[in-house]
């Protein structure tokens, strides 16, 4: 008999159930976690031995959504799930980020976490459920893991924090923040906000961390009941003698190398020092392990940089802790794009473009949570040349998808509504140089490019990356970190926002002991940096341009009676296709009768508007129109009277005398005056040539 072990607890307004012991018993650990009908099955498998020569920790996190979870069959040709969607990739990263720092530094065994969404309630996003499941499975597995962690989503509705808001509640929320951490420390924050203050953002982080303690307590209780024995794994003892010898040979030289401000020159010098030291030590003792020497050199290198910062000495590139690198801001640099900007901060540079399209250019996204249309796209590209390397060029990698999403979060709060600006907007950030915080450079460049394109954004936004070096109670917060400071520091803290508040916050912490005070210092320092960058950006462009590019489509909006939509579309789309070809415009019709006409030429748009007005104009009974014979039948002729309208002239209404044969009087394409005699309930028009040609008949109205 399979006997599951279950923990059930209340988590805000939801009930969470964690179950183990029933499924995937050959995995190292497996749990089924559910929150109000949203269920995620999470497995962990760890290899007992590391691969020989393994130099990094091979942790893989795969989050996958199954369409059966929502009672659907995939719409693809093969009717099965394919490559991960952007949403699945982002959630995989969301799980990876808080768990990765909790494995011991020298643990190099392969670990794979797979989270599969097997049931979904559209009101409950599976990402928090998957995070809880990954934490529970790792804690149960016995793998060396300094967890468990908890996870919470925090909303901000009516000036109150809301724990794990539903999908409907999030639509009313000014904040969507995910926080994960251990009992004593926040490890990861991912959020977007509607221009909230630093205090409100920090309050949300603290609130989420406090509330998730119930998750950690219940996972610990489950581990006590069902946890597997801890692995008999010990970190390799440090070779103190070799460490001292490496430090003696390399420390001073690395200190000098890290005074070289130019990145590539510094890297060349550091690589040369490492090669010299390794060669010298192996020459003295060829039994030494070159990989071990490299690991010790990396440790010495880290200590050199961190010690200088903690002593208050200038940073790698000579700056003080709160200084921003030199900025160069340019707009309108690409002549045929709709908007463009080149944003340079030190050795980080982004070429950003904005392109305007129509509603049919919007992205239709089919997710488990339901279908939606996205009319604002932001894509981030990180080619290998931006860091002076060669490499594969192709579809975006996980990192590019994640950085693009963060940059989009930073800009989203200031974007105009569809009613204010009915365009689909695509921003592309090409990172042409990178030495720290290219995602935040993308935020700055996106703001500039959107303004250059004439998009009426509510405010300019800028982003900044902060870092932290902490030893004991001594800590230093660094503004505008370099790539090396990110790699060698204890925290990566990215903040985007306008002059009035924060629009996005992302935080990844590698150590415990990050207090509210430290986060407060970092947020306040980031605000000063953000305002400085905004000041420089505003010198280049301070408000959106008054008009969009001459190469961008202009969208004109008109409204018709919804009952007339069928007339504009025509049978099988014949009328709207003819209109599009005739006027050279793009025409989109909504169910409420709103028509959007896009054209690069204003005269073409006006022509399309005039033709639609003709088609939708009410036919007046008793009025005489100039018509054209379009079809001849035995009992009469069909005559077009303009605006896509066509009526029947019965054989008895062609002439004053009896007509035996219609073709004796009318030919195809012949212009004839006709009088509207009747429009019946079905919209059919009865015409008369006889009545239109009487001596007292008025002059016909021209058909177009």
Curated annotation (Swiss-Prot):
GO annotation (BP), single: mRNA catabolic process
Catalytic activity: RNA(n+1) + phosphate = RNA(n) + a ribonucleoside 5'-diphosphate
Organism of provenance: Yersinia pseudotuberculosis serotype IB (strain PB1/+)
Domain S1 motif: 622-690
Protein name, per record: Polyribonucleotide nucleotidyltransferase
Cofactor: Mg(2+)
Entry binding sites for Mg(2+): 486, 492
EC number: 2.7.7.8
Gene that specifies this protein: pnp
A Gene Ontology cellular-component term: cytosol
SMART domains (UniProt xref): KH, S1
CDD domains xref list: KH-I_PNPase, RNase_PH_PNPase_1, RNase_PH_PNPase_2, S1_PNPase
Enzyme kind, highest EC tier: transferase
All copies of domain KH, residue ranges: 553-612
Keyword hit for Disulfide bond: no
Keyword Transferase in record: yes
Role according to the record: Involved in mRNA degradation. Catalyzes the phosphorolysis of single-stranded polyribonucleotides processively in the 3'- to 5'-direction.
Keyword line: Cytoplasm, Magnesium, Metal-binding, Nucleotidyltransferase, RNA-binding, Transferase
Coiled coil feature spans: none
Database matches in HAMAP family: PNPase
Similarity section: Belongs to the polyribonucleotide nucleotidyltransferase family.
InterPro entries: ExoRNase_PH_dom1, ExoRNase_PH_dom2, ExoRNase_PH_dom2_sf, KH_dom, KH_dom_type_1, KH_dom_type_1_sf, NA-bd_OB-fold, PNPase
GO MF, one annotated term: polyribonucleotide nucleotidyltransferase activity
């Amino acid at each position: 008999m399979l006997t599951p072990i279950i923990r059930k607890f209340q988590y805000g307004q939801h009930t969470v159930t964690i179950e183990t012991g029933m499924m995937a018993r050959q995995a190292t650990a497996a749990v089924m976690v559910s929150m109000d009908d949203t269920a995620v099955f999470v497995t962990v498998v760890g290899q007992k031995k590391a691969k020989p020569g393994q130099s990094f920790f091979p942790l893989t996190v795969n989050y996958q959504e199954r369409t059966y979870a929502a009672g659907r069959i995939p719409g693809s040709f093969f009717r099965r799930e394919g490559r991960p969607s952007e949403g699945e990739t982002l959630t995989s990263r969301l799980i990876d980020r808080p768990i990765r720092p909790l494995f011991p530094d020298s643990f190099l065994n392969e670990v794979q976490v797979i989270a599969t969404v097997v049931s979904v309630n559209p009101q409950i996003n599976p990402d928090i459920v998957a995070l809880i499941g990954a934490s529970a499975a790792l804690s149960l597995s016995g793998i060396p893991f300094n967890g468990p962690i908890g996870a919470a989503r925090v909303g901000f509705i009516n000036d109150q924090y809301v724990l794990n808001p539903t999908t409907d509640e999030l639509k009313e929320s000014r904040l969507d923040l995910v926080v994960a951490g251990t009992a004593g420390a926040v490890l990861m924050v991912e959020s977007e906000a509607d221009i909230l203050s630093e205090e409100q953002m920090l309050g949300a982080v603290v609130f989420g961390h406090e509330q998730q303690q119930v998750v950690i307590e219940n996972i610990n209780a489950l581990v006590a009941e069902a946890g597997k024995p801890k692995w008999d794994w010990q970190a390799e003892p440090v070779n103190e003698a070799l460490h001292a010898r490496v430090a003696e040979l390399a420390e001073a030289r690395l200190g000098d190398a890290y005074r070289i401000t130019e990145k590539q020159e510094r890297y060349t010098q550091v690589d040369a020092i490492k090669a010299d030291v390794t060669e010298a030590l192996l020459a003295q003792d060829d039994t030494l392990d070159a990989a071990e020497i490299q690991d010790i050199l990396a440790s010495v290198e880290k200590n050199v940089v961190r010690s200088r910062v903690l002593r208050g000495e200038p940073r790698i590139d000579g700056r003080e802790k709160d200084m921003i690198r030199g900025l160069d801001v340019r707009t309108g640099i690409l002549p045929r794009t709709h908007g463009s900007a080149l944003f340079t901060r030190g050795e980080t540079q982004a070429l950003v473009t904005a392109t305007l399209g129509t509603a049919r250019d919007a992205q239709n996204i089919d997710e488990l949570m339901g279908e939606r249309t996205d009319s604002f796209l932001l894509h981030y590209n990180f080619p290998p040349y931006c860091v002076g390397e060669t490499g594969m060029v192709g579809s975006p990698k996980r990192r590019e998808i994640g950085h693009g999403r963060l940059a989009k979060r930073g800009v989203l709060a200031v974007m105009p509504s569809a009613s204010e600006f009915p365009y689909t907007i695509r921003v592309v950030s090409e990172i042409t140089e990178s030495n720290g915080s290219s995602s935040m450079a993308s935020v700055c460049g996106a703001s500039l490019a959107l303004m250059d394109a004439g998009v009426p954004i509510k405010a300019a936004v800028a982003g900044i990356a902060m870092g932290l070096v902490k030893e004991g109670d001594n800590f230093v917060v660094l503004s505008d970190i370099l790539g090396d400071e990110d790699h060698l520091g204890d925290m990566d803290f990215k903040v985007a926002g306008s002059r009035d508040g924060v629009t996005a916050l992302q935080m990844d912490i590698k150590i415990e002991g990050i207090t509210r005070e430290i986060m407060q210092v970092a947020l306040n320092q980031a605000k000063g940096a953000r305002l400085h960058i905004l000041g420089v950006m505003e010198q280049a462009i301070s408000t959106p341009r008054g008009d969009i590019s001459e190469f961008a489509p202009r969208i004109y909006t008109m409204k018709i009676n919804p009952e007339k939509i069928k007339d504009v579309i025509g049978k099988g789309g014949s009328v709207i296709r003819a209109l599009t070809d005739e006027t050279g415009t793009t025409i989109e019709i909504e169910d409420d009768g709103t028509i959007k006409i896009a054209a690069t030429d204003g005269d073409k748009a006006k022509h399309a508007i005039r033709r639609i007005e003709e088609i939708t104009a009410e036919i007046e009974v008793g009025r005489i129109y100039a018509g054209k014979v379009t079809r001849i039948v035995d009992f009469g002729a069909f005559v077009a009277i303009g605006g896509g309208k066509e009526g029947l002239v019965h054989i008895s209404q062609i002439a004053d005398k009896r007509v035996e044969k219609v073709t004796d009087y009318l030919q195809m394409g012949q212009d004839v005056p006709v009088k509207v005699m009747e429009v019946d309930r079905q919209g059919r028009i009865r015409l008369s040539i006889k009545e239109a040609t009487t001596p007292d008949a008025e002059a016909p109205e021209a058909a177009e």
